[in-house]
From Swiss-Prot:
The chain crosses the membrane at residues 82-102, 127-147. Gene3D superfamilies: Photosystem I PsaL, reaction centre subunit XI. It is a multi-pass membrane protein. Belongs to the PsaL family. Keywords: Membrane, Photosynthesis, Photosystem I, Thylakoid, Transmembrane, Transmembrane helix. This is Photosystem I reaction center subunit XI. One of its GO terms (cellular component) is plasma membrane-derived thylakoid membrane. It comes from Synechocystis sp. (strain ATCC 27184 / PCC 6803 / Kazusa). HAMAP family: PSI_PsaL. It is found in: Cellular thylakoid membrane. It comes from the Bacteria. GO terms for biological process: photosynthesis.
Length: 157
């Protein structure tokens, strides 16, 4: 009979943790990748974490609203995408603020500043500013796509 090696094992040998150690989830590459995300990167203040997360979200939220939104077949599709993305960022900021207020009521600061009400408030503020900025950058690029395309093609030397 062939001997089989278990690829999926309990995390740190403890089956009661509720996490499985797989070649993907427990690899050095995955740990490095997740460790470099703004939520886990060391040395970032909560407002900078929120700013970075917000910029990414604001930038990529324009696309679905532009291509799939109610104004997709009109000349106002880009402004419709901008308004939809800004509204969604506003709702997400309200949800982040509510989460921070409810979760960290009356708790004093711990080692991680993101685990306090004040830190979470800073994260939400950074998310709002970054999200709005990212959405406006994406709108500017979409609205001036012919100019940006010309720059990359070398027409403006």
């Amino acid at each position: 009979m062939a001997e089989s090696n278990q690829v999926v094992q309990a995390y740190n040998g403890d089956p009661f943790v509720g996490h499985l150690s797989t070649p993907i989830s427990d690899s050095a590459f995955t740990r490095t990748f997740i460790g470099n995300l703004p939520a886990y990167r060391k040395g970032l203040s909560p407002i900078l974490r929120g700013l970075e997360v917000g910029m990414a979200h604001g930038y990529f939220l324009i696309g679905p609203w532009t291509l799939l939104g109610p104004l997709r077949d009109s000349e106002y599709q880009y402004i419709g995408g901008l308004i939809g993305a800004l509204a969604l960022i506003l709702v997400a900021t309200a949800a982040l603020s509510s989460y921070g207020l409810v979760t960290f009521q009356g708790e004093q600061g711990s080692g991680d500043t993101l685990q306090t009400a004040d830190g979470w408030s800073q994260f939400a503020a950074g998310f709002f500013v970054g999200g709005m900025g990212g959405a406006f950058v994406a709108y500017f690029l979409l609205e001036n796509l012919s100019v940006v395309d010309g720059i990359f093609r070398g027409l403006f030397n």
